[in-house]
Every structure is written in C-alpha cells, then in structure tokens.
Amino acid sequence: MSKIANGNWNETKWQPLRAGIERVVFAMEADTLCCTIGRVENGNEVKPHTHPNEQVALVLEGECDYYVAGVPYRLTAGSWVTVPPNVEHYIHVYDSPVPCLQIDIFTPDRPEYTESFTAFLAEEEGK
C-alpha cells in the first residue's frame, strides 16, 4: 500500500546519469507511478529509447525539443507531452537559456529508478 510522503527536491542530492543530465526520483513510496525531476544541459547526449511505461514529460524551466515517434515537440516552461508505452522518444536540449528542468511521471511504477536512486543516496551518505 502506498505511503504518504513529502519532500523538497532542492534539498536532495541530484544523481548524475550521464554528461549533462542529472535527476532526483521522488514519490518513491507510490505503488503505481514514478516521478522524477531531471536537469538537462545544452548539448546533452541524445539517447532514443522506449519503455513499457506511459509517461508525461512536463517542462518547468528552459526549452527543449522532445521527440516522440520521430515528431519533435518544442517544449518551453509549462509545456508537456505524453509518451505512449513502447514508443521511441528522447529529449534534445541545444539552445535553452537555462538548463531544462522537467518532471517525468511514469505509470506503472519504475522500480529500477527507485532502486538506482536509493543506492545513489546510500553511497553519497557513505562518503
């Protein structure tokens, strides 16, 4: 059963994923969804991928092109796009005045994200 939880991503360490991309996983106590906030720098490595999860990508700051099924969607602060399950997609940040800050909501849950982020936090605490 899901637990009630709260927090502030500004008070959490950011997990580096690859050059120019880092994230915080939150709502880890939820049973049926996963939420992340990502910070993506200009010139990020473009990495097309698919997954069985439905996804909503919502931009809070900055700008990006978000490709879904080969179609580019220009996202600015307040913009969002949905990604159906198993559809190729990726983010491309190349001319944003600030790093692109975006929230991703996935359903069903992404336990691999929770496990990876939990391990990252434990490693950081051990330093």
What are the roles of these predicted feature ranges?
Residues 1-32, 117-127:
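A short, N-terminal "cap"/entry segment at the start of jelly-roll beta-barrel domains
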Residues 18, 32-33, 38, 90-127:
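Double-stranded beta-helix
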Residues 35-50:
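Conserved short histidine dyad/triad with adjacent acidic residue
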Residues 42, 52, 71, 87-88, ...:
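A generic "binding-loop/recognition-motif" signal
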Residues 48, 66-67, 83, 89-96:
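Short beta-strand His + acidic residue motifs that chelate non-heme Fe in jelly-roll/DSBH
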Residues 53-64, 69:
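Glycine- and acidic-residue-biased ligand/ion/polar-headgroup-sensing regions
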Residues 54, 82-83, 104-108:
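Hydrophobic alpha-helical segments of small multi-pass membrane proteins
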Residues 70-86:
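Short acidic-glycine-tyrosine-enriched beta hairpin
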